[in-house]
């Protein structure tokens, strides 16, 4: 349903209570597992294919990677300002093209439940990180066959950054051990690996690194949010950080910590376990580069133990050269949450001023021109969208949609064009009148609402293959603006294209089904989430499947082209 005007919702406390009940400890402990297909089904996905990697390869004479062609898509944009916008010329697609798409090919990956990564597209090559399969592929955009394959030897965590260093194209990404990989984009050969973690802080690397000149900027998402669910754990120890590495060697240049190292606080849980803090304020997503101001902007999540800090649920500006903190905008103070809070666990200690709502910033801040000024715009899981002055961090405008949730309102980020900001909202269904899943637009200059589309569940003929079809259908994945269209997708696997000016639905496609694949691996789609939507070289690419949080697993990368 399209609405010509936006509406800023008031806060309904019962919504949060009911949603948190859904996030029981049992649910969160299954993060990362597949639900629509069992583990055995995933293992069987490769049966009948003697070697699924070999079956994916292009003919020997068709494996050359031409890096002299145009870079048409990177997750952060070439400038690193994260606009999630590509022009018609850059993408090779017009709004009219996007209103009539057809499937060109599909490739599947065995033992895979989630398609979480954004690709890099250079000319006729799409570089894709099959994170569950521990591999990076250089795929031909026309056919889907592989020109080369890099085996990292362990699961990967992030999307990829692309840069040209000393005349050579490189790809940079992280793995689940906290290591950064640099490989040749032309051949897939490894240049080096190095730790991306900050000292004395063993955190995950989730967000995409950014290449800027001679440096790689690495976000660190340490927090203890998961281990806090263990009642015997002395919660909590780790915290968010940023490291800067030498792009040629991986040597560390500087590091920034969102807070001091945790110490024993003198507090004990209800079961007598000692508590540590401060902790948390993880940086889940990609830093934003502002070369003109020589600044980096990062967004953070909640604290995971007491004492809380001024850097949680915040947007932070750092000096690009030194990592020194320049300013901090905190959207919500005293948000202390860990997995113990989902089931009233002993490590969830609620004080008088504790919010305990888990309202991270899950997506990056976007640096965008709005008339005669620049703004820094970001969406939050509270359902807020914030616009700041990048010089000082001062608030310019703010709007809020609904109550927000621990897995929404805005989960993985927003997109912009020259006139509007577009925010996806992932409120789950069945939560009463305050559930507002959909796509919302705001005029950049003023923050005034434009149009919004309130998505509704569609279970007819689909509920037998969609887990929780009536509740999981909101828009969680990071949206993308191409020319005059906005591309987004639902946790029920539906892909949507909207007219950016009016909100009219231009195209819809159900990806939650089985697919024939170019490499012979059994392919099936599911929830579309994370950073799984991209466009470039005249095509739209979508990763379908996201098995975390009781969502629908899948293992396919889908390529769409304008219908002939």
Task: For the regions a language model picked out, list residue spans one by one.
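Blade/loop signatures of beta-propeller domains
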Residues: 43-103, 258, 263
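Repeat-blade elements of multi-bladed beta-propeller folds
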Residues: 70-80, 112-135, 153-180, 202-234, ...
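Beta-propeller blade signature
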Residues: 238-251, 311-324, 436-447, 554-563
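Short loop/turn segments that connect beta-strands within beta-propeller blades
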Residues: 140-143, 184-187, 246-249, 320-322, ...
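Bacterial N-terminal signal peptides
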Residues: 22-34
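Conserved blade-register residue in beta-propeller folds
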Residues: 138, 182, 244, 317, ...
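Surface-exposed loop and turn segments in beta-propeller and other repeat-based domains
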Residues: 107-109, 195-200, 253-277, 326-356, ...
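Bacterial N-terminal signal peptides that target proteins for export
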Residues: 10-25
